[in-house]
Amino acid sequence: MASKGGRDKIKLESTAGTGHFYTTTKNKRTMPEKMEISKFDPVARKHVPYKETKIK
């Protein structure tokens, strides 16, 4: 059975251009703006900003 909640799956893509991404969920009602967070990119081997993109 599917969940009723307002959480949507999102993809956080690296801005370093390596193609690496993380997936997570986000509550669209409390955070309508696009997310940007600094996370570790194992391809670049350093912390870089990750920006929210749509899951295709």
UniProtKB/Swiss-Prot annotation:
Keyword annotations: Ribonucleoprotein, Ribosomal protein
PROSITE patterns xrefs: RIBOSOMAL_L33
InterPro entries: Ribosomal_bL33, Ribosomal_bL33_CS, Ribosomal_bL33_sf, Ribosomal_zn-bd
Polar residues compositional bias, start-end: 15-25
Keyword Transmembrane: no
Cysteines engaged in disulfide bonds, as pairs: none
Region feature Disordered, mapped onto this chain: 1-40
Bias (Basic and acidic residues) ranges: 1-12, 30-40
GO molecular function list: structural constituent of ribosome
GO CC list: cytosolic large ribosomal subunit
Gene Ontology biological-process annotations: translation
Gene3D superfamilies from the UniProt entry: Ribosomal protein L33
Family stated for the protein in its record: Belongs to the bacterial ribosomal protein bL33 family.
HAMAP family assigned to the protein according to its UniProt record, in alphabetical order: Ribosomal_bL33 (MF_00294)
Name of the molecule in the record: Large ribosomal subunit protein bL33
Organism: Cupriavidus metallidurans (strain ATCC 43123 / DSM 2839 / NBRC 102507 / CH34)
